[in-house]
Structure formats: C-alpha cells, structure tokens
A protein has these predicted regions:
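Binuclear metal-dependent phosphoesterase catalytic core
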Residues: 2-5, 11, 70-71, 83-87, ...
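Active-site neighborhood of phospho(di)ester-bond hydrolases with catalytic His/Asp-centered motifs
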Residues: 10-13, 33-39, 57-62, 79, ...
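Active-site environment of divalent metal-dependent phosphoester hydrolases
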Residues: 15-19, 40-46, 62-69, 99-103, ...
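Short, conserved loop/helix-junction motifs that constitute active-site signature segments
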Residues: 28-29, 49-53, 126, 159-163, ...
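Conserved catalytic scaffold of divalent metal-dependent phosphoesterases
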Residues: 10-19, 63-151, 197, 220
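A generic local structural motif
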Residues: 19-25, 42-46, 77-79, 118-121, ...
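N-terminal active-site segment of His-dependent metallophosphoesterases
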Residues: 1-51, 121-129, 223
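A short, gly/pro- and small-residue-rich
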Residues: 52-63, 153-156
Length: 224
C-alpha cells in the first residue's frame, strides 16, 4: 500500500502577512491540518477558516485572555487540556506559559502545569500514547528564554521522555528574539518545531505505523 504524507501548517504568536493579506486560499491549498500554538487574534483564526477545509486545532497563549470575554474562535477546535485524535494522530494540548505576573490569564507555575499534564495521563494511556505534543510555551532548556516569562516547562521534557511523541510543536519564543534560535531541532526521537508566525511540515499518514507505535508503547509500560 502506498504511503502518503499529511501536510500541517503550524502557526503562533504573529499573524502571517502572507496568509492575512493576500491570496490566502492559494497559500492554504494542500494543507490538511492547521495547528495554532496560541497568542493569535480570534479574527485571524476565524479568517483562515473561510479559506480552507483543514481543521484548525489550537491551544491558548498567555495573551489570549480576550477569548474569555469575546468567545473562543468560531469554526476552530480547542484542544487544551485533552488528548485529541484527528485521523489517528493523537495530539496532547497544553497551552499557556510560565507565570510571570498577576494580570494575564493562561499563566502557570511549573507545579500547576505538571498537574495539568498529570490529569491527561489517563487519556494518553487509554489511547496508547501520543504522537504530537502541542503547547504554547517551550520545554525547559530547549531553546527557551532566560527571562521569567519565556522560561520553558520542565514537565514538557518529562512528557517527551515518557511518551516519545514524534513531534513537539510550540510557540511563545519569537525567532526574532535571538538569531541563533533554531526553527526545528530534536530531542531524542522527537522533532521540536517553533511555530512562530508559520511553518509547514509533513508527517507520515500511516495507520500501520501508528498501530506499531501503540504496540511499542504498551510493551514499554508492561515491562515496567
């Protein structure tokens, strides 16, 4: 059986002028799934839904407090605090960033974020693991910032160690902050992507491979 790829558009933090202003439909052609890592205007996400049949899955950023008064983006799917499955792809969503003040919503201490991740263990185990970790903030020590607001979460590293997802997609740390920040790197078997503004990548659409991943996950846990 011939294997095909799924084309994913990851977006975060900064609305892309290329998508916002000009020939949006053509630029979204061929995109199968859109993942938003947060801090994007509600109207921007809703605008994109008008030009693509691809579902838009999102987590909250620390500047998305307006969603609580204006409502969540219409036509999009919030995957915060759940393990959401799209065509066999198991996505764990954990939005927000490190707490750095008392004003903005979607800010968490390390302890609070770890508690959120722990609450998703049952969902993840029931589904035989996760394939993609979708967050707003980066992982601690993995291309995160040195200031309090942009420090990463250590528990994200633990999630990568435990579940070994194929991909970890985050935002929050703008690439313009440091010219040395990589767009893509890796940690173990996980490809780590900084989705600031926009980034397109492909993953295998292989139900057979996902079945094998689930089998390996359960073999790992049964051996403990």
């Amino acid at each position: 059986m011939e294997h095909t790829n799924v084309k994913i558009l990851a977006i975060s933090d900064v609305p892309s002028k290329a998508l916002w202003d000009y020939d949006t439909r053509a630029r979204l052609e061929g995109i199968d799934l859109i993942l938003s890592c947060g801090d994007l205007p509600k109207k921007y996400l809703e605008y994109l839904t008008n030009f693509t049949a691809a579902p838009i899955l999102y987590v909250h950023g620390n500047h998305d407090g307006s969603y609580q008064t204006e409502g969540e983006p219409g036509g999009c799917i919030c995957v915060d605090d759940q393990v959401y499955t799209w065509k066999g792809l198991r996505i764990m969503g954990l939005g927000g960033c490190q707490r750095y003040n008392k004003e903005d919503t979607y800010q968490y201490t390390e302890k609070a974020m770890r508690r959120r991740a722990h609450k998703l263990e049952h969902q993840a185990h029931k589904k035989g693991g996760i394939d993609l970790l979708l967050t707003h903030a980066p992982a601690a020590g993995l291309n995160d910032g040195t200031d309090r607001a942009h420090k990463g979460f250590a528990c994200f590293n633990d999630l990568m160690d435990e579940y070994e997802p194929g991909w970890f997609v985050h935002g929050h740390v703008h690439l313009c902050y440091d010219a040395k920040l990589p767009r893509v790197c890796s940690r173990g078997n996980t490809t780590v992507i900084n989705a600031t503004e926009r980034y397109v990548f492909e993953i295998p659409d292989r139900q057979q491979d996902m079945t094998q991943q689930r089998r390996c996950f359960w073999q790992k846990w049964l051996a403990i």
